[in-house]
Structures are given as structure tokens and as C-alpha cells.
Amino acid sequence: MLRASSVLPRGSWHEPAADVVVLDYDARHRRRIRMRGVRGLDFLLDLENALMLRHGDAVKLDDGRLIEIVAAPEHLVEITCPDAAKLAKIAWHLGNRHLPVEFAGTKLRIRYDPVIASMLKNFSARLREIEAPFEPEGGAYAGSGQDHHDHSHGEHTQGEHTHDEAAEPHHHG
């Protein structure tokens, strides 16, 4: 089976792709998985570390051909506010819940979640459900190959929490 072991960032490659894979946000965070392109090309994605594949990236096959990465449309909520301070407050609350957030100019985008949508309405946010590719920020550790930082909160969901509840003291940044 053909193997893809390297990623070429968007804009760094110009030759035609041999095939295309269309993946949602979760499916683009991979290290090793068998994939099939839309034209039927089977290959093994076999990266050294798990990383976030971005829309427009390409993975390079052992034989030199490229497979283009396309971000699939997803059910999202686009968030706007009457002023920047309210939008910043909302961004803080979303970050405190460790939710991936896409910054789109003066709008925020998150994956649709009815509980989070209800919370945002309480902050006087304007919400619009859309179908679009989801390209959230990589986070403070994205440059080092990680998309999320490690620390233990014990068992919890991504709901409301404070870091005072953490199993061990820790700091961000």
C-alpha cells in the first residue's frame, strides 16, 4: 500500500494532486490511518506525530504524488456581537471550555452545540447556523506539533470549570 509520511503546507506545493481527501475537523487530526481519495486512491497516512491537516495542505506519497486535503463543510455557529468587548468576553468563555474556535474577521465560528448556543444567547450574541469548513486556531502549542495542551482536571466534560479544581496546580503559557 502507498504511504504518505510528509505534509506540505498550503501554498508550498503547485503540482496537480493525484487525488483529494475531504475530511471534517476531527478527521483532519491524524497520525496514522488508512484513507481513500475521492478518485479511489488508497493510501496509508503514516506521520511521525499526530497533527492538524489544514485545508489546502497536501500529503506526499512514497512515489512522489500528492494528495490534497480539503476541509469538509460542517454544521457551525457563526457568532457576532455589537462590540469588540462582548466578542472578546465570548471568546474567553469558549476558550475556558477548551472549545476549538475559528476567528473569521469580526466573527467567531464554533461547531454547533445547543448547550453552548444557549449560553451564548445569554451573552447577547447574535448566532447564525451555517454549513462551512471549520478551520479553528491551532492553539498556543500548535507550532510544536500539538493542537492542545496537557493537564489533568480529573474527570470532566468540556463544560464550565475553573482551574482551581485541577488535580495538580498548573499554569497556561
From Swiss-Prot:
CDD domains assigned: UreE (cd00571)
Major localization class: cytoplasm
One annotated GO biological process: protein folding
Compartments reported by the entry: Cytoplasm
GO terms, molecular function: nickel cation binding; unfolded protein binding
Sequence segments annotated as region (Disordered): 136-173
Keyword Cytoplasm among UniProt keywords: yes
Keyword line: Chaperone, Cytoplasm, Nickel
Classification via InterPro entries: UreE, UreE_C_dom, UreE_N, UreE_N_sf
Family: Belongs to the UreE family.
Name of the protein this chain belongs to: Urease accessory protein UreE
Upper taxonomic lineage: Bacteria, Pseudomonadati, Pseudomonadota, Alphaproteobacteria, Hyphomicrobiales
